[in-house]
């Protein structure tokens, strides 16, 4: 998990250009006015809430990260945990909206609704995990418990792999 997440972080700046997003010339963080960046940021904020809830239910300290630097007010562990789900939950949904994003100049309420609905559908979707059909939201909760086990009992944490 740790090596994989570190590699994805380093590759993140090249990712959008490689997938030929219509409106994205470079990745920008919070406060971006460019529509694709704003859509990604909006989607990540929704994903953050799902991850926050799963980790909190598992009894983990949300501000004590493993990869992200601990900073006051930053839920570092939540940001670490999100890495496992970013591409599958958010990026896929934003890519599906690329035709709309190319026509918009800002993140409209209708576009926000589409992002919310897409992410909600993804989190509610049944995925085969360990031989069983399980909702992604439940898989996320199980992964949070596994992470708690890895942190407290020294067990090995194995991240989930999504098949495109």
Language-model features: locations:
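Active-site helix-to-loop segments that bind/position phosphate- or nucleotide-bearing substrates
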Residues: 1-164
């Amino acid at each position: 998990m740790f090596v994989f997440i570190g590699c994805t972080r380093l590759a993140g700046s090249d990712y959008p250009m490689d997938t030929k997003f219509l409106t994205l010339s470079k990745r920008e963080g919070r406060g971006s006015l460019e529509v694709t960046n704003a859509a990604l940021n909006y989607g990540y904020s929704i994903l953050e809430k799902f991850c926050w809830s799963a980790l909190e239910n598992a009894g983990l300290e949300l501000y004590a990260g493993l990869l992200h630097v601990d900073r006051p007010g930053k839920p570092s562990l939540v940001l670490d945990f999100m890495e496992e789900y970013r591409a599958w939950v958010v990026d896929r949904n934003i890519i599906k909206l690329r035709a709309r994003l190319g026509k918009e100049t800002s993140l409209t309420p209708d576009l926000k609704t589409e992002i919310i609905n897409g992410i909600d559908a993804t989190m509610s979707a049944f995925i085969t995990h360990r031989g069983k059909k399980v909702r992604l939201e439940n898989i996320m909760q199980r992964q949070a418990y596994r992470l708690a086990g890895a942190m407290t009992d020294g067990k090995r944490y194995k991240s989930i792999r999504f098949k495109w």
